[in-house]
Amino acid sequence: MDFFFFIKVKIKMVCFSVPSLILEGWVSFFVFFLHNRIMNILQEIFTDHYEEIKYTLHPRPAEMENIDKMINCGDPSYGGAMYGCIHCGNLKFVPFRCHSRFCPTCGNKYSMDRTTSMSFKLVNVRHRHCVFTIDASLRDFFLQDRSLLNCLFHSVSSVVLRLFSKMNKHKNFTPGFIMVLHTFGRDLKWNPHIHCLISEGGYSDDAFWRNVSHFNYTFLRNAFRTALLKEMLLRIGPSFKKVSARCYLEHEHGFYVYAKPNRCDPKTVTKYIGRYLGRPVIATSRVDSYTGDLVSFHYNRHEDDQYVQETIPVMDFIKRLIRHIPEKHFKMIRYGGLYARHRSIDKKLHLAISKEKRHTFRCFNRWRTAILSSFGYDPLICPHCKQQMVILEIYHHHRRVPLEELYEKAMSRSRGKRSSA
């Protein structure tokens, strides 16, 4: 109530001292401030149950750090940029975002950036999208000791390189592949698996490209099972022997490795990677309702693409989500073969996206362009006079700043720029 009283007093004071356009600018800023403090549904859920999460779930430091970031994402008191129109005095404050992959807004932006970076690596050939899954009995080992997730990457990398080495005659053909770790299934439960984008061909040491159209999935399944179980046995020790023996017995044909039915064409590579490899754990659009105690969300079941809606207790929903937050500095995306090395001979390869086009692709990921393409309006065009707004002030380091001071400084700069225009 004190803040709203301050606003009313401030507007009355301004009415007698500045032109009406400046008053409209202040009101516009105030409305924008209120708009940006409307939380999305995930922020609301985690804010309502913050103490319960902290003191009953005992989250990992990485989980707590990302929860704090996500809750405060878009909070103007943590800093931002003030834009102003030098023609009419209209002001617009754009708060900084948290840049957490766990945040639905920033996670989507992160996915866009990573998708673009991955697409710049790809050679201009078809790529096969393979998914390497594990036995359900092994999942808890990766949950209890997250360093074991490295075994998944090592196993997939060794298997793909061995697959191509078996095809080699007298030349050493090396494929390029990108591995992306997903720890979630569509129902948000813990289900670590690797998505791997593999070039349909390999590059020899003497600059010769060999196309490969057939992948031996029998070999991939058996080799991946063997490589992973051996890696885990070395890491865990003798206590893992019984589990390993049971996996060999129950999966005599290897762990399930399958290919997506549609291949990754060079012309649509960015869209393909974004759809299958770059997606966040859950989008806010999949959360249907939140009552305070229960959360309803939906997904299409993997087995038959059947629409499924689940309603579960809110704390169960939170537990399902936060377990997918990786440890700090853990790499969820890794490159192998051609895409992991930097040799002068590899520069002869024709890339799917040329260096001349990369600037254009990066532009689509910028805040202003992304808003324009997604919502159809330019956020830096003044809604009153349709002129481009300019930046007046930046507050950073997520330190809290008094909004009255922010307003006074911004107005002072706005007057100075308009008088010199």
Regions found by a protein language model. Give the residues of each.
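Serine-biased, low-complexity intrinsically disordered segments, primarily in secretory-pathway proteins
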Residues: F4-F6
